[in-house]
């Protein structure tokens, strides 16, 4: 009774009790979700991967591209689960961490996997019939193969949330504190790496799309190696005459101004001709009007060493988004230039 009373009055003991409750709750969630995750990994491995391999419906390179490191990820989960069931969280996660690179490899292959799936569904009748048949099994609960393939990447995000929470609610004098802290750090680093891979893949898709919109000799290789930020129509206000609509593509280092091809152009209808490239490292941006958020739109001024560009939009929200994106690009380029000068 005395011990219980002292615990109720001692803030340190109360805090430790809260940590322990959160730790137990998090560990239970990690265990239960790992069981479900392993079940889904096993279903895909059993009813898709291994049968396809045995039947030879897909050639080995296509099969490897479609599923990537799936079987190895499944094996890693099979190793981890018994430790979680026995409450040996630190030891289990310590043994699991060397397998985290499989998730980075899986992420790097994810775009090619989805492309391969769509291509095979379109051209391979045997594969299409097989996939439809297997997806109809009650074990998959209406999920399609394309919904199941991203499962490891979704689970990695869960790992990060749960393992970090487990480490944060473990007292430093706990036997598995060091193991859990290290595991949380490694899982978070892998999740960040996977996020960067995903961002790079999305950027590559944007660049391919933009490159397809640009035509003419000047357009070749314009998007190579760049980071896409945004695109849209803006009105260019000349010193004299009427404003002219132009399509703008903003990348991390340049602003590309393009003019649409004539609608009746025989070969290039719907594409754009590059008219100018403006380096963001040399840009000074200011908002001439449109600060108040009213309905009249606004005007941006972009000054370069040898040219001044006035861009107008009747949409106040769109202009604000352009101002924000341009500001980020300019700041990033000037910061990069400053670092380069400092390094030399």
Swiss-Prot record:
Compartment annotation: Cell membrane
Q: Which UniProt keywords apply?
A: Cell membrane, Guanine-nucleotide releasing factor, Membrane
Its GO biological process annotations read:
positive regulation of cell migration
The molecular function terms in GO held by this entry are: guanyl-nucleotide exchange factor activity
SMART domains linked: PH, RhoGEF
Q: Does the keyword Membrane apply?
A: yes
Task: Enumerate the spans annotated as PH domain.
Answer: 227-331
Protein name stated in the entry = Rho guanine nucleotide exchange factor 39
Under Pfam families, the record lists:
RhoGEF
According to the entry, every stretch annotated as the DH domain falls at: 22-197
The job of this chain, per UniProt, is described as: Promotes cell proliferation.
> What are the record's GO terms for cellular component?
plasma membrane
Q: Which InterPro entries match?
A: ARHGEF39 (IPR042987), DBL_dom_sf (IPR035899), DH_dom (IPR000219), PH-like_dom_sf (IPR011993), PH_domain (IPR001849)
